[in-house]
């Protein structure tokens, strides 16, 4: 099994996504775990969402819409057919983000940070997974939060390596391209860490 990691700058736009496809076609994609960061400066943009959330700023909605617009443009650049399932999948991710912002009761900054910033990686891997499938590569999108188990020390969680190894062994498919997120895990209550 090979592991490739693509950082945010390498997947900041449609051309970057196409380049990842080109790299995988060149080096092979069977028995691969592809770990992908949030696209471009998405983490910074989501940190602005967090700031607006805690400040109860009227700019909260527009800061979310900026992140959404950025990702929707990449999706439009990759997929001309707006009926492609990727549009629904990305919109579902943003619906989850908006639901969290509307219903969260926790005042814990670190908890909120982990829940919100994680959407960058979740959305980027969703887009990349759909594009690889669209290009004919058998792909398994893996929510790394189901694999990497941690304690509840938000923003500085410690990994339960024994449980994590078991989860990876059980979930990762050989002979296919497994696309997942970096920097994420989840605690015993399945909250993102």
Regions of interest found by a model, annotated:
Residues 1-193:
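Nucleotide/pyrophosphate-binding catalytic subdomain
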